[in-house]
Amino acid sequence: MTTTVETAVATGRVARVIGPVVDVEFPVDAMPDMYNALHVEVADPANAGEKKTLTLEVAQHLGDGLVRTISMQPTDGLVRQAAVTDTGTGITVPVGDFTKGKVFNTLGEVLNVDEKYDGERWSIHRKAPRFDELESKTEMFETGVKVIDLLTPYVKGGKIGLFGGAGVGKTVLIQEMIYRVANNHDGVSVFAGVGERTREGNDLIEEMSDSGVIDKTALVFGQMDEPPGTRLRVALAGLTMAEYFRDVQKQDVLFFIDNIFRFTQAGSEVSTLLGRMPSAVGYQPNLADEMGLLQERITSTRGHSITSMQAIYVPADDLTDPAPATTFAHLDATTVLSRPISEKGIYPAVDPLDSTSRILDPRYIAQDHYDAAMRVKTVLQKYKDLQDIIAILGIDELGEEDKLVVHRARRVERFLSQNTHVAKQFTGVDGSDVPLDESITAFNAIIDGEYDHFPEQAFFMCGGIEDLKANAKELGVS
């Protein structure tokens, strides 16, 4: 289950190098197991006269003592006949409190501080929890964010897809969730940066340091410029750290993957390098299997959970593409961040009509919660249907009933906005946590017309009912 010391069990020789694919010859009676990590020393091109250690992962047994491996680093300087050592175990990463506030690569090496680690390490290749270890009941994960809790409730131990382009508030929402898990649930977060831009990873680390959430977070990065083997394994490395917090420290964990599409893309590259026949649209034939091995480990065990938020890039906006389509099969909720909503200054810019949740159903949530969510969605949908008429003829041409719908829908839309804790350094305004019961009461009251006399501005960026009344009082209405 755990590995603390690497033990060399066999030595082989490099037989062939083709880019990140390295064939290694071993004695037939000392073959390394599948997914074992192999080490080979090569000359470091960046530092003349110095050596560096490459890590290779066994991907195929070719027969006659030959194994095909994928390198986790660039293979510059690697030559045939170089000695290769089998570590006797898979790639391992540090686990436990040491990981908090640290930035790691796929191999578990610390990147942001010069600190050695001699403690416990776990292999990144692990089995999903057994069926009898799983939490049988479906439980809502309350965040304190009105629009999420009311309209797209998250499942404890579930998987949430996060859709959003650049500049619509995705990073702020991710940081806010990390903050709320740490402060409201006394939990910890793990962030896996899979195949994204190095600049974005650096920006995230800086912003998390500024907002004070990095000390409750472990970060693992395998960025866009790294070999496909690294990008394929980085999500597993992050998930292994999260599993330790769940299984050993008995904590609730929030696990972020940015971007899950890059995980699939890396798998496709590795599959091609290994000579497998491509499947639909050029993807790997084992796409569903690879995705399942990752997603099935993200779950609730008895009393503790890993809840996952996964940023999803949709190639060419085609939801039927095999990569996003395979991911959708595993999701419990989708949170869609909308540019038109963010342009109105409404944050979090969650689209209440496009976002969905599996548990927005009376079987899983209270009837009053379901009824309130349906009322909000109905009034917003009516408002959306009327917008074309308003744009062409103007609001004065609507009937009295439709005018009332628009009047209340605009207030509901603004009341879905909320100040966040992590944005306080920019806005100067404290974030708010709104209990679900208060959200239900407030939205029912707005739709029933109890606050029709309040100006629209009073509903903007406020928390619960008391905040709303305070805003209205400042605007001269009571």
Curated annotation (Swiss-Prot):
Keywords: ATP synthesis, ATP-binding, Cell membrane, CF(1), Hydrogen ion transport, Ion transport, Membrane, Nucleotide-binding, Translocase, Transport. It is a peripheral membrane protein. InterPro entries: AAA+_ATPase (IPR003593), ATP-synt_VA_C (IPR055190), ATP_synth_F1_bsu (IPR005722), ATPase_a/bsu_AS (IPR020003), ATPase_alpha/beta_chains (IPR050053), ATPase_F1/V1/A1_a/bsu_N (IPR004100), ATPase_F1/V1/A1_a/bsu_N_sf (IPR036121), ATPase_F1/V1/A1_a/bsu_nucl-bd (IPR000194). It is an enzyme of class 7 (translocase). ATP binds at residues 164-171. GO terms for cellular component: plasma membrane; proton-transporting ATP synthase complex. PROSITE patterns: ATPASE_ALPHA_BETA. It catalyses: ATP + H2O + 4 H(+)(in) = ADP + phosphate + 5 H(+)(out). Its EC number is 7.1.2.2. Gene3D superfamilies: 2.40.10.170, Bovine Mitochondrial F1-atpase, Atp Synthase Beta Chain, Chain D, domain 3, P-loop containing nucleotide triphosphate hydrolases. It is found in: Cell membrane. The keyword Phosphoprotein does not apply. The keyword Cell membrane applies. SUPFAM superfamilies: C-terminal domain of alpha and beta subunits of F1 ATP synthase (SSF47917), N-terminal domain of alpha and beta subunits of F1 ATP synthase (SSF50615), P-loop containing nucleoside triphosphate hydrolases (SSF52540). One of its GO terms (molecular function) is ATP hydrolysis activity. Coiled coil: none annotated. NCBIfam families: atpD. Produces ATP from ADP in the presence of a proton gradient across the membrane. The catalytic sites are hosted primarily by the beta subunits. F-type ATPases have 2 components, CF(1) - the catalytic core - and CF(0) - the membrane proton channel. CF(1) has five subunits: alpha(3), beta(3), gamma(1), delta(1), epsilon(1). CF(0) has three main subunits: a(1), b(2) and c(9-12). The alpha and beta chains form an alternating ring which encloses part of the gamma chain. CF(1) is attached to CF(0) by a central stalk formed by the gamma and epsilon chains, while a peripheral stalk is formed by the delta and b chains. Belongs to the ATPase alpha/beta chains family. This is ATP synthase subunit beta. It comes from Streptomyces avermitilis (strain ATCC 31267 / DSM 46492 / JCM 5070 / NBRC 14893 / NCIMB 12804 / NRRL 8165 / MA-4680). The lineage of its organism: Bacteria, Bacillati, Actinomycetota, Actinomycetes, Kitasatosporales.
